[in-house]
Swiss-Prot record:
It comes from the Eukaryota. Expressed in salivary glands. GO terms for cellular component: extracellular region. This is Complement inhibitor RaCI4. Disulfide bonds join C37-C61, C42-C63, C57-C78. One of its GO terms (molecular function) is toxin activity.
């Protein structure tokens, strides 16, 4: 084997080792474990008119589907929506 072939083989082996070592699917969890949305499963289905209906998430939660398409039934997980507060002035317009 020539030096170039050995070098190429070493590069490929290193790349495969790095790929195996550094690519893993980490489980996602809600930020607050005690929220109303944690560990709640939701589902997207279609009613008799073909409209998408989401079931299972409490108010203030967002259902994130585990599906690639938007036109299929899917299961998902509920996540808490971020809450923000706005301050208004006496004129009724939001303060900057």
């Amino acid at each position: 084997m020539s030096a170039f072939n050995i070098f190429a083989l070493v590069v490929v082996v290193c790349a495969l080792m790095i790929n195996e070592c550094c690519t893993s699917q980490e489980p996602t969890t809600p930020l607050k474990a005690a929220s109303q949305c944690s560990n709640v499963k939701c589902r997207r289905r279609f009613d008799h008119l073909g409209n998408s209906v989401t079931e299972g998430c409490p108010s203030g939660c967002l259902c994130v589907y585990q599906a690639t398409g938007y036109n299929q039934e899917a299961n998902g997980t509920c996540y808490e929506l971020m809450k923000t507060s706005t301050t208004t002035t006496t004129e009724g317009t939001p303060a900057q």
